[in-house]
């Protein structure tokens, strides 16, 4: 288990695996339920609909492959499928995080208190309701940072050759970094750390965050497992916060 005494940051793979363990801790499971329900309803329904549409979408996407790349069609077809899953998975993951943001913040707060022995501010339904405007403002900040970059990458998908080869790789790397920001931000925001300061802090552990975000992105594409990924990622990111940044940025001890 992660503890506040841990001084050496570990890999993103470690923190992601810790997330799966931490969601089962007694006393933490009840804070997992609401984020889990939001994710199951939204991601479950979204991916069921997606798989009914893939037969039409993939041929349409492959029609943009230029003649000189047709000989690579057998390789580009799975890349096209992965591209659709990446974009679709990230979009609905972002939507689910918007809806569940107050509950994800509460989960991060309670887990941090459990891992460190620190006393969090008073929480409850009234506390969550009071914090909703601030939490939603933070989600808008993340969206404003994300959208311009995402639009540029999506435009690349419509460029013959690049859209079927380079764009999926760039999108995967971008979504990995953005998912690291999304989930690590919950404990940072609980301590009122500004969004810009949070991003600067994450860059000090860039490799670990890319590993964490990449695994989160991959699991978002896997049916059944993607239903559980939201609370798992919140817990893993909170463990990373405790080890890497809490000593410098904590508002409450």
From Swiss-Prot:
InterPro entries: CysZ_sulfate_transptr (IPR050480), Sulfate_CysZ (IPR022985). It is found in: Cell inner membrane. It is a multi-pass membrane protein. Pfam families: EI24. GO terms for cellular component: plasma membrane. GO terms for biological process: cysteine biosynthetic process; sulfate assimilation. The chain crosses the membrane at residues 31-51, 72-92, 151-171, 222-242. GO terms for molecular function: high-affinity sulfate:proton symporter activity. It comes from the Bacteria. Keywords: Amino-acid biosynthesis, Cell inner membrane, Cell membrane, Cysteine biosynthesis, Membrane, Sulfate transport, Transmembrane, Transmembrane helix, Transport. PANTHER family: SULFATE TRANSPORTER CYSZ. HAMAP family: CysZ (MF_00468). Possibly involved in sulfate transport. Belongs to the CysZ family. This is Sulfate transporter CysZ. The lineage of its organism: Bacteria, Pseudomonadati, Pseudomonadota, Gammaproteobacteria, Enterobacterales. The gene is cysZ.
């Amino acid at each position: 288990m992660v503890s506040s005494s841990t001084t050496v940051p570990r890999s993103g793979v470690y923190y992601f695996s810790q997330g799966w363990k931490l969601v089962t801790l007694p006393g933490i499971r009840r804070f997992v339920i609401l984020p889990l329900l939001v994710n199951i309803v939204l991601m479950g329904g979204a991916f069921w609909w997606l798989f009914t549409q893939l037969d039409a979408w993939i041929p349409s996407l492959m029609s943009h492959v230029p003649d000189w790349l047709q000989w690579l069609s057998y390789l580009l077809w799975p890349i096209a499928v992965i591209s659709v899953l990446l974009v679709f998975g990230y979009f609905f993951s972002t939507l689910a995080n918007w809806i569940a943001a107050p509950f994800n913040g509460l989960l991060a707060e309670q887990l941090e208190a459990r891992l460190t022995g620190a006393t969090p501010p008073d929480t409850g339904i009234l506390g969550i309701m009071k914090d909703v405007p601030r939490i939603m403002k933070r989600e808008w900040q993340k969206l404003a940072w994300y959208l311009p970059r995402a639009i540029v990458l999506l435009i690349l998908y419509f460029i013959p050759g690049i859209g079927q080869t380079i764009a999926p790789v760039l999108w995967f790397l971008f979504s990995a970094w953005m998912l690291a920001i999304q989930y690590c931000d919950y404990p940072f925001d609980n301590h009122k750390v500004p969004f810009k300061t949070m991003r600067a802090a994450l860059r000090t552990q860039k490799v670990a965050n890319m590993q964490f975000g990449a695994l989160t992105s991959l699991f978002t594409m896997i049916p059944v497992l993607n239903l559980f990924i939201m609370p798992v990622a919140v817990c893993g990111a909170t463990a990373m916060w405790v080890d890497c940044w809490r000593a410098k940025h904590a508002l409450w001890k």
